């Protein structure tokens, strides 16, 4: 009888945090047969795959494409795999006043950050076994509403709530879900996000590296934590949101933008 392949699936694997997950997992996990890397940009996927030691399956697809997701589900069944870890790192954000960003761009955020993440989790769950892990990229933006980041912050609040609830549903079966809630991370995220608005300078002062973010995320997953907040500044911010009323935080943030 042929043993099932143990795999790790990473969405958004061609750049940023997703790419860093791929690189760190490649060196840290020896009992994995394949790493499946998913992203739209095939050329970028190939660049990452070239430097990895594990066998890599590069899947160029748009996670918001329903037909592509159907094909991916069929691939899972065909390959006879056990998903040892799912990392939902695909996502993006745009800054700016709600009425100045296009409706298409903002609904795209909903599709990528919420709907696609939910679908990918649902599709992969039947192929998981006791000890499998799910890591969902949320954000410190999930802790409080944010002016000029309204839709993005709302999508990440969904990811955080969904992930922590799902962890409670699955932990009795030996499956664990970790929501990762970083503040600013030194990736190309902000190059895209700042097309229509600028980031508060105080946020940039709290920026951490993708290496630190991913390292803390993997360690939290190993420890079966349902949430991790990488970086000391964001841990302090999270504590602040529990003490200070959200209305006051919103007023202070608004004054700082003037």
Model-predicted segments: where are they?
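Substrate-binding pocket helix/loop in short-chain dehydrogenase/reductase
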Residues: 97-98, 102-110
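Residue(s) in the substrate-gating loop at a strand-loop-helix junction
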Residues: 139
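Active-site helix of classical SDR
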Residues: 121, 155
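Conserved glycine-rich cofactor-binding loop
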Residues: 14-15
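Conserved glycine-rich Rossmann-like NAD(P)H-binding loop of the short-chain dehydrogenase/reductase
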Residues: 29-47
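C-terminal helical subdomain
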Residues: 179, 200-237
